[in-house]
């Protein structure tokens, strides 16, 4: 039985949006936001300008969607790696946090995340968008982890939400330092040592 017209249209629209995001992501990483035009994006995606403006208000709106896409991919990667590591070598929740922070800092040296999220993101979208991104993908995850760690008595009882915001602020600053550094790998190592010392200090005595 043939699919309804509405279903086919929805599938086509989703495919067009995915093509635009894929093309824009590659261009924003390779050339940066300022050097990428909407003409570049529609040519790479092989769609019309009308299709682009049907899905996105303007180039900034497209960039916002790409940045969220990159951030979501990173979270999936971090969570997946953490689950795999926990299965292979079970450790304490504090150990898992230390490993997760190290993995996040490694990702900050990655081209997609560094260029789109760390370099262009704060400049193009401003601090409000950055705060929204960190809250959506960082604060909620850390709050849940901290609550579990407190319940298992690995760390002292503290306001989990406030502590999560403070840790995310540290991670955010570290990531921006790495993204703007002349030597990102060295900055990553230095920031990693400092953050690890802070996290170890959370251990319940």
Task: Give the location of each predicted region.
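Alpha-helical DNA-contacting segments of helix-turn-helix folds
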Residues: 64-70
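Hydrophobic alpha-helical connector segments
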Residues: 65, 79-110, 163-167
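Amphipathic alpha-helical segments used for helix-helix packing
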Residues: 108-128, 176, 180
């Amino acid at each position: 039985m043939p699919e309804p017209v509405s279903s086919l249209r929805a599938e086509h629209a989703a495919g067009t949006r995915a093509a635009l995001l894929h093309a824009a992501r590659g261009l924003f990483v390779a050339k940066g936001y300022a050097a990428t035009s909407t003409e570049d994006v529609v040519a790479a995606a092989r769609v019309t300008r009308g299709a682009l403006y049907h899905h996105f208000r303007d180039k900034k709106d497209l960039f916002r969607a790409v940045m969220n896409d990159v951030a979501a991919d990173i979270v999936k990667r971090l969570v997946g790696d953490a689950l795999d590591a926990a299965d292979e070598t079970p450790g304490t929740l504090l150990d898992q946090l230390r490993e997760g922070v190290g993995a996040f800092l490694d990702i900050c040296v990655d081209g997609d995340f560094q260029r789109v999220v760390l370099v262009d993101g704060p400049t193009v979208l401003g601090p409000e968008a950055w705060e929204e991104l960190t809250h959506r993908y960082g604060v909620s995850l850390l709050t849940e982890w901290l609550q579990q760690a407190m319940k298992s008595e690995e760390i002292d009882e503290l306001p989990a939400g406030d502590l999560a915001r403070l840790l995310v602020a540290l991670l955010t600053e570290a990531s921006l330092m790495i993204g703007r550094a002349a030597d990102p790998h060295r900055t990553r190592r230095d920031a990693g040592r400092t953050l690890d010392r802070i996290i170890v200090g959370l251990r319940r005595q």
